[in-house]
Amino acid sequence: MKLRENARFSTICIHAGQVPDPSTGAIITPIYQTSTYVQDALGVHKGYEYARTQNPTRSALEANIAAIERGKAGFAFASGMAAEGAVMTLLKSGDHVVVTDNTYGGTYRLFEHVLRKYGLDFTYADTSRLDEIERAIRPNTKMLFLETPTNPVLRLTDLTGACEIAHRHDVYVVVDNTFASPFVQRPIDFGADLVVHSTTKFLNGHSDSVGGVVVAVRDDHIEWLRFVQNAEGAILGPMDAWLVLRGTKTLPIRMERHNANAMALAEYLASHPRVPRVLYPGLTSHPQHELARRQMCGFGGLISFHAGSLERARTVLNGVRLMALAESLGGVETLISHPATMTHASVPIERREQIGITDDLVRISVGIEDIDDLKDDLSQALDR
């Protein structure tokens, strides 16, 4: 079970970080549900002392996702927001961050309502336009925080171009890769310094775990994140780590189906007379379709569309039978949501409208069900 250096993506997902249990030979990493570890003698231990600091199940997951994202080290946290919070401790009071303007509502809440109190400054820019990134950078800018595709309007950032601009100004780049998943894109390949995920989503893939991860490439970032993970203690528990490890093994085959179903459903919606506009990078009508073709392997499992009015959106959301009305994304089941009142409710209405999150916008996290069943469900909801 030795993983070769040139192993391909699916093989890495299954085997990276995985070692048969030395005492039993169990092929699957055990759930080490313990808070502490017995030492052989004073100062003599097997590499584990206290579970906040180290846990073998968590360590296996961290190695697995670091390899999947082509980073040097990974750090697993209790949620995606805990992972983002850890990354932000790389900054100090007075530092400035340029952020994708259409970022996740929870990220906006953390930055605006928590971190501003500690002296960090944020500028929200349309990072789909490289000139906007250049204009937003100041002498005290330390970080470029990107989300691509964005949630929920699926706007893309040219990662190669953005990283070149940032590094020219000695600014490091953080990419939230939750929406795409590493199957679709690996930001480190394009120059990113740090990648964050909510493992709750595609990495876990089964809607039964909440967690987050940071993948780093720079030694100074790795050293600091290891310290902060232990100091703050917002760690991922062993059961959740095991669930995500189970999920990453099937990530490639799940993402193939997510991508295929989303493409088919987007094309169906685009042809429906009661749908004014569909947002999906795989459609040639998407303004950044060519960038998506260059930067992404597939176009992801998320679709957004305009229903025409809040009432029409409500009719569709309440009318589906197979799809579940719920927040989150990336599970095997299809979820449908209303960003303006759900995932982005914490974003002020004027800002939501500015970035395209209108009251008629509906988001679908496309699952891996039979595509004809998904079309049938949407059809009966749209025809109401």
Give the residues covered by each predicted segment.
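PLP-dependent enzyme catalytic core of the Aspartate aminotransferase-like
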Residues: 121, 135, 139, 254, ...
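Conserved PLP-enzyme active-site core in the AAT-like
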Residues: 2-5, 15, 73-274, 279
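N-terminal "arm"/small-domain region of PLP-dependent enzymes with the aminotransferase-like
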Residues: 2-55, 61-64
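Conserved N-terminal alpha-helix of the aminotransferase class I/II PLP-enzyme fold
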Residues: 36-85, 89-90, 106-113
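C-terminal core of ALDH-fold dehydrogenases
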Residues: 10-27, 311-351
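Short, well-ordered beta-strand elements within core beta-sheets of diverse protein domains
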Residues: 244-253, 300-308, 363-367
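Short loop segments at secondary-structure junctions
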Residues: 36-38, 216-220, 248, 307-311
